C-alpha cells in the first residue's frame, strides 16, 4: 500500500458498522506503564516543565453494561472538579481512556472540555488534533498505541 488512506479502506481494516472500521477500536497488546510521582521541587531537577497533578478522580464500573463507562467518566470528572474547582474549560489538553475513536470526543463533552453535542464538529474540523485549539489524546490514545490491559 502506498498511503495510510489506502490502508484505511483496505481488507486489513474491515468495516465494522456504517461508519466504523477495525482500526477505530482499541487493539489488545502486551505492555506496561509507569509514572513517577514526586514533589514539584524535585521534578525541577529533571525537567524545566514538570507536569503538576492538581487532582485525581477515579470510578469503577461493572463491565457487563457498556453504558456504565459513561457514568464512570462523569463520576471521576465530578471528583476532580470538586477537588480543584476547575472545569473542562480550564484544561489545555484532554486524554480520554478510549475504547473506540468516538469515545474521545464523547468523554470530552461529558467533562465540559468540548461543548455538548459539538464534539463531532470539532473532530471534523481537526480542532482536536495535536495542533488544534482543543487537543485530545495527542499520544494517539489506546486505539493507536494499543491496550495492554491494566496498564492504561
Predicted regions and their residues:
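Conserved active-site "lid/cap" helical segment
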Residues: 1, 19, 76-92, 103
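Glycine-rich, mobile lid/loop segments that gate access to catalytic sites or pores
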Residues: 1-20
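Condensing-enzyme catalytic core mediating Claisen C-C bond formation in acyl metabolism
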Residues: 14-79, 125-139, 143-144
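Generic secondary-structure signature for well-ordered alpha-helical cores
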Residues: 41-44, 82-85, 109-113
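Short, conserved beta-strand edge motifs with alternating hydrophobic and charged residues
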Residues: 53-54, 93-97
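Short, catalytically relevant binding-site loops at active-site mouths
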Residues: 59-60, 73, 87, 98-102
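Short glycine/threonine-rich loop-to-helix capping motif typified by GTGT followed
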Residues: 65-69, 98-121, 150
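Hydrophobic alpha-helical bundle architecture
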Residues: 85-94, 137-146
Amino acid at each position: 500500500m502506498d498511503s495510510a488512506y489506502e490502508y484505511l479502506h483496505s481488507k486489513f481494516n474491515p468495516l465494522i458498522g456504517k461508519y466504523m472500521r477495525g482500526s477505530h477500536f482499541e487493539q489488545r497488546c502486551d505492555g506496561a506503564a509507569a509514572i513517577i510521582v514526586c514533589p514539584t521541587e524535585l521534578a525541577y531537577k529533571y525537567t524545566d516543565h514538570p507536569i503538576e497533578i492538581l487532582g485525581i478522580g477515579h470510578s469503577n464500573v461493572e463491565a457487563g453494561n457498556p453504558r456504565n463507562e459513561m457514568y464512570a467518566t462523569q463520576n471521576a470528572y465530578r471528583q476532580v472538579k470538586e477537588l480543584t474547582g476547575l472545569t473542562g474549560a480550564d484544561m489545555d489538553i484532554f486524554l480520554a481512556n478510549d475504547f473506540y475513536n468516538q469515545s474521545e470526543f464523547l468523554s470530552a463533552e461529558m467533562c465540559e472540555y468540548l461543548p455538548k453535542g459539538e464534539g463531532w464538529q470539532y473532530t471534523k474540523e481537526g480542532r482536536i488534533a495535536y495542533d488544534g485549539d482543543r487537543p485530545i489524546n495527542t499520544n494517539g490514545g489506546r486505539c493507536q498505541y494499543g491496550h495492554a490491559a491494566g496498564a492504561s
